[in-house]
């Protein structure tokens, strides 16, 4: 538990030198196999910072090492979005979540690999090369926060931040056997997150158990005047309402049949096994229809690609970022900068988004997608008024082999079937490990009603006690 690490650092049972040295020994041994980082900070700098931060006796994370996804701005530390166009970009400011981490004494060890601009489900679209799953080096760790998932499963650090636009925290959590939370939209500031799709994405915590997940979420959540989409909440009341002891006998869970039917047999078997255990503990489970499931992926990708084409228009290689150099014609220079600076998947989504937003297609596609999103949100809200949670496998498949889906966009997009619904509805969703198939982790996803984040984490604590799957580290 992270609280034990903090206590050991503060009372001197664990010295900063030993703590950091052991971590860098793991990096030396494991990182060359999994490639979870894009940038790793200097060891002596980290030791000095840990020493300084443990003097902060009140810091919840005093001296704790944490890995940050490389689309979250970090003052003085390269932030690339795993793209050539931002290969040498160093932000002049910290994201709000990074400020909050530092205020509690956390130390950023480095920036994790990801799909380029968070566009992908396997961490194979990174300009810096793919990350490999610590449980099987021939397989993907999921995406787009694959580096953050792999760095936990590889045993390098205990905490990481990711971002989730359509499942980008939960997919790597499932494929790496760790915990990940996509928070309620507006509960965590997006200031400093390099945008992909503003209306869908959230920064969220990743950890190896529910207790540490809650601690990290508690640090990063809260209103921020620099992000107008954040909401004002009484954090203590919000936490108290969700953290009170959950009596499993009073819990009602809905399973969406339409989603479950699309899952592979090993995934379904692990999912049914944990449901049986929950039923034996007194949980009530109903299988219900969700006829809008078939429209979730098309609506999600239409909205996400449209927002991406707008957000990424700012990257032209003139003011900052990769430049192919001015050749006398600005139009050609812009085109060359973007053509060489962006990868194939990013260019695909920009072009599709531009097409969707063009005259004649805007109402036919984009407006219809927004209407479908509203219908999905209303239906999810209706279900969550009758049930405490909605359960599904996090991913419909086991981790695919590297190269298996990245060359087939439709196959890659279909991996997000179970996860995009929470982003469209703006509700919190959590993934945690519930089993293995051929040494490959399988995850359970739970969705809760808006602002039920702490309640979601609390039920996760109950489930990890029942399943015994937590604090997992791959034997690598």
UniProtKB/Swiss-Prot annotation:
One of its GO terms (cellular component) is glutamyl-tRNA(Gln) amidotransferase complex. Signal peptide: none annotated. It is an enzyme of class 6 (ligase). One of its GO terms (molecular function) is ATP binding. The active site is at residues 69, 144, 168. Its EC number is 6.3.5.7. This is Glutamyl-tRNA(Gln) amidotransferase subunit A.
